[in-house]
């Protein structure tokens, strides 16, 4: 069944030996404003990898890690917040690249703080090494950690970490007594 699940790229739920359902860990990736232009926008800073290629790498890694993954990009802060709210009870972790909202996304910061699951902030570039106004993230205090400056690898490293954090924070099935 595990092989079939990997081939189909989806979760197959099965009852375990004790009758417990073992659902696949669900993770969310949020890409903020202008990230749909990766590969075209300032390639000397962000590289030539497109957002579609990043998402492909993330989905391939998710299959390897045996987690379910949804990637979502919006140029609108409210849409990113709505996606978090819609998944508050269904995902176990999230990666967020707030992009231009890094310095000004107060509402996104507040939405992230309200999530019951771990959230990591990722950036393709090292924001601390760029213009002084980019160096401070108002999102960072709301997240568990930040990965930056590694290009698309910030995302894949983040996915590995958030999958591990999500697995650690999942409740274990309660034992039944005879």
Region locations from a protein language model:
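Short, glycine-/small-residue-rich phosphate/pyrophosphate-handling segment
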Residues: 129-171
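Extreme N-terminal starter segment of soluble prokaryotic enzymes
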Residues: 24-27
